[in-house]
């Protein structure tokens, strides 16, 4: 520990800390622009100047390491004058257009100019003006406002892992740019908007829509992937205006993927706001009572074993649990969250979880990806791994034909024989597995989406056992899920095998990705919020609330249950999922023993201990899985993935459609 004096108080800080960090620990407010605790130090802005005894001039506290016996002053006349001077220089070329700037009201420059500036301007010459840059459909630029803090450049290099931002020219003529002025290639580019301390980088979809003080803030969870990123929904009235990240050190830190951030406009289009019944081959509007009576009459006429429920990728645990309870009361045990027919082993909970945990990857020293496209399936997790790789603390290898990653990776090939050789110890890479202290394996849909997925998974379990990858001090076996509802559904047993061709009645709870040709003879009920393929094939449509319009629990890929709170009201006469299921049970004269959300959660917590520990990870058991089957000769591939359109909300997002178009144009230029 290092001892130093700050404004007359003795404090101790860790060796390697900066003066800025020491001052912050001592409770001192130090203004800054370029410094960010998650980025490398740049020392560009000089706003963090403090006085150090025996130094003839102020020092940049963000770049100065602490040493024993230092005496620091943060509020002397010298410091005040230095900060006033720095602020005056920063404002020389700034346009001072706060009334029309989207950053107004939440701008670091605005706040610090008011707190530390002089209040008068001595500069009367012409200001510098810079042409705005094109960075794609997500980021709107106003580069005349840029103060060259280089946060965006450092984020692109250090966090996103794609070196596509930089500075050109020098001095007053310096410009921050994306070089070729084309769409940014990162799936996390929106975070540059958050870390920009001025209004140089703004959200293009949110431009000129609202001011911060007009918005209601609601804590929620990102549902467009299985990471469980913590988000804040900003709404005005019943409209979602924007989505921002919330800090959660164990999951997303303070970052957010572009799909979770920008796809919210999909909530406005193709919404189901009325019940519908198919009559004479056409869907016609109906009342709630008429729709529920039609369903109840049909259910009574069908044998229980011919009834099944299938949940989609955006469904909450409470909705699945309530529907499961209803089906069991009817005498049916056919229900599944697995609309893609993924090959999951549910022998033990640890067999289908990301056991290392998202934060735990920082302990690993070797990572083997098998059929896993981390960059597009889990961008935030991919960023964590990339930072470790660039720091030289982690080596990553891959089995499977895949997409470009944002870090150096050893490509082992895509042949199934590689996994077989690893299982028996004859492959060259086994040396690395044996030498690693904390090896981890990540299994993606390139494995569990295959017909021979169980057989491959059995081989992977042999590798796990052979190299002691699952042990008390480090659990290195991980399943990489790609949908928000899957882990929660598996946790409550909403995963029984279903033969679609034999069904006479199918209840689709937000499920749109089924092979509907296998359901031609079935009566289809669709409960959901968007008019997609599920609604198009339905005989009865029940309009439901989206994730922003109801409260629900989602379990992320590491097994952590989290609550997404209700931000706005449902559209039209749409209702919340559990309310619809409760009313349907009433129409069937069935008592499912749960009348509201609180009662559902109490029952969940009693039956499954993980739901008594919200926001926490409960220790899960792991068991070796063995399955004998013929292996396909097909190579392991991740397949083409349209990152921006993976569910009914993102598919109906105009912003996501623009991203797809912009990415295609970028790829054409690259070709």
UniProtKB/Swiss-Prot annotation:
Pfam families: Fer2_4, Fer4_NDSU1, Fer4_Nqo3, Molybdopterin, NADH-G_4Fe-4S_3, NADH_dhqG_C. Binds 1 [2Fe-2S] cluster per subunit. SMART domains: NADH-G_4Fe-4S_3. Keywords: 2Fe-2S, 4Fe-4S, Iron, Iron-sulfur, Metal-binding, NAD, Quinone, Translocase. Residues 78-117 form the 4Fe-4S His(Cys)3-ligated-type domain. Its cofactor is [2Fe-2S] cluster; [4Fe-4S] cluster. Its EC number is 7.1.1.-. One of its GO terms (biological process) is ATP synthesis coupled electron transport. Gene3D superfamilies: 3.10.20.740, 3.30.70.20, 3.40.50.740, Dimethylsulfoxide Reductase, domain 2. [2Fe-2S] cluster binds at residues 34, 45, 48, 62. InterPro entries: 2Fe-2S_ferredoxin-like_sf, 2Fe-2S_ferredoxin-type, Mopterin_OxRdtase, Mopterin_OxRdtase_4Fe-4S_dom, NADH_UbQ_OxRdtase_75kDa_su_CS, NADH_UbQ_OxRdtase_ferredoxin, NADH_UbQ_OxRdtase_Gsu, NADH_UbQ_OxRdtase_Gsu_4Fe4S-bd. Residues 1-78 form the 2Fe-2S ferredoxin-type domain. GO terms for cellular component: membrane. It catalyses: a quinone + NADH + 5 H(+)(in) = a quinol + NAD(+) + 4 H(+)(out). Residues 215-271 form the 4Fe-4S Mo/W bis-MGD-type domain. It is an enzyme of class 7 (translocase). PANTHER family: NADH-UBIQUINONE OXIDOREDUCTASE 75 KDA SUBUNIT, MITOCHONDRIAL, RESPIRATORY NITRATE REDUCTASE. Belongs to the complex I 75 kDa subunit family. NDH-1 shuttles electrons from NADH, via FMN and iron-sulfur (Fe-S) centers, to quinones in the respiratory chain. Couples the redox reaction to proton translocation (for every two electrons transferred, four hydrogen ions are translocated across the cytoplasmic membrane), and thus conserves the redox energy in a proton gradient. This is NADH-quinone oxidoreductase subunit G. It comes from Rickettsia felis (strain ATCC VR-1525 / URRWXCal2) (Rickettsia azadi).
């Amino acid at each position: 520990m290092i001892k130093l004096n700050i404004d007359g108080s003795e404090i101790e800080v860790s060796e390697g800390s900066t003066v800025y960090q020491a001052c912050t620990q001592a409770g001192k407010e130090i203004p800054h622009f370029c410094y960010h605790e998650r980025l490398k130090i740049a020392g560009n802005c000089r706003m963090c100047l403090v006085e150090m005894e025996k130094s003839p001039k102020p020092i940049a506290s963000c770049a100065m390491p602490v040493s024993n016996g230092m005496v620091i002053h943060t509020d002397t006349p010298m410091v005040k004058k230095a900060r006033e001077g720095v602020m005056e220089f920063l404002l020389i070329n700034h346009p001072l257009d706060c009334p029309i700037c989207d950053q107004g009201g939440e701008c670091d420059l605005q706040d610090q100019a008011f707190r530390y500036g002089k209040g008068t301007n001595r500069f009367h010459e012409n200001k510098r003006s810079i042409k705005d840059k094109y960075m794609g459909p997500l980021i709107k630029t106003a580069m005349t406002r840029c103060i060259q803090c280089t946060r965006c450049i450092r984020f692109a290099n250090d966090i996103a892992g794609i070196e596509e931002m930089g500075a050109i020219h020098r001095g007053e003529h310096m410009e921050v740019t994306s070089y070729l002025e084309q769409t940014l290639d990162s799936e996390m580019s929106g975070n540059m908007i958050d870390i920009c301390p001025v209004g140089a980088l703004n959200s293009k979809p949110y431009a000129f829509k609202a001011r911060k003080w007009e918005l209601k803030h609601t804590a929620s969870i990102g549902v467009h992937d299985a990471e469980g990123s913590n988000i804040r929904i900003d709404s005005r009235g019943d409209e979602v205006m924007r989505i921002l990240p919330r800090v959660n050190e164990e999951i997303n830190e303070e970052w957010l993927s572009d799909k979770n951030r920008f796809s919210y406009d999909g909530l406005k289009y193709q919404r189901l706001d009325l019940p519908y019944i198919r009559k004479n081959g056409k869907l016609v509007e109906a009342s709630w009572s008429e729709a529920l009576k039609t369903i109840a009459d049909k259910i009574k006429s069908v044998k229980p074993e011919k009834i099944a429920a299938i949940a989609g990728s955006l469904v909450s645990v409470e909705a699945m649990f309530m529907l499961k309870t209803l089906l069991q009361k009817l005498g049916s045990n056919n229900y599944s969250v697995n609309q893609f027919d993924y090959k999951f082993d549910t022998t033990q909970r640890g067999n289908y979880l990301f056991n290392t945990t998202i934060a735990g990857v920082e302990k690993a020293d070797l990572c083997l990806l098998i059929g896993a496209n981390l960059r597009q399936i889990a961008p935030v997790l991919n960023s964590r791994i990339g930072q470790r790789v660039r720091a030289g603390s982690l080596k990553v290898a891959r089995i499977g034909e895949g997409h470009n990653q944002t870090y150096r990776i050893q490509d082992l090939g895509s042949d199934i024989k590689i996994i077989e050789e690893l299982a028996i110890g004859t492959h060259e890479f086994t040396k690395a597995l044996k030498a690693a202290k904390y090896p981890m394996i990540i299994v993606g849909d390139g494995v569990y989406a295959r017909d021979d997925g169980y057989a491959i998974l059995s081989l992977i379990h042999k590798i796990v056992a052979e190299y002691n990858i699952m042990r008390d001090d480090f659990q290195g076996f991980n399943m990489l899920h790609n949908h928000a509802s899957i882990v929660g559904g598996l946790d409550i047993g909403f995963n029984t095998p279903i033969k679609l061709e034999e069904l006479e009645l199918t209840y689709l709870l937000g499920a749109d990705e089924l092979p509907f040709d296998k359901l031609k003879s079935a009566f289809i009920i669709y409960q959901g919020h968007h008019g997609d393929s599920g609604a198009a094939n339905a005989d009865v449509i029940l309009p439901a609330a989206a994730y922003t319009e109801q409260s629900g629990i989602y379990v992320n890929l590491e097994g952590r249950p989290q609550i997404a709170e209700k931000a706005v009201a449902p559209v039209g006469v749409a209702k919340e999922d559990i309310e619809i299921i409760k009313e349907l049970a009433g129409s069937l004269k069935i008592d499912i023993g749960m009348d509201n959300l609180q009662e559902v959660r109490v029952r969940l917590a009693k039956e499954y201990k993980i739901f008594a520990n919200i926001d926490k990870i409960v220790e899960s058991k792991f068991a070796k899985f063995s399955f004998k089957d013929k292996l396909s000769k097909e190579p392991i591939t991740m397949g083409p993935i349209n990152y921006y359109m993976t569910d009914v909300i993102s598919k109906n997002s105009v912003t996501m459609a623009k991203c797809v178009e912009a990415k295609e144009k970028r790829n054409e230029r690259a070709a």
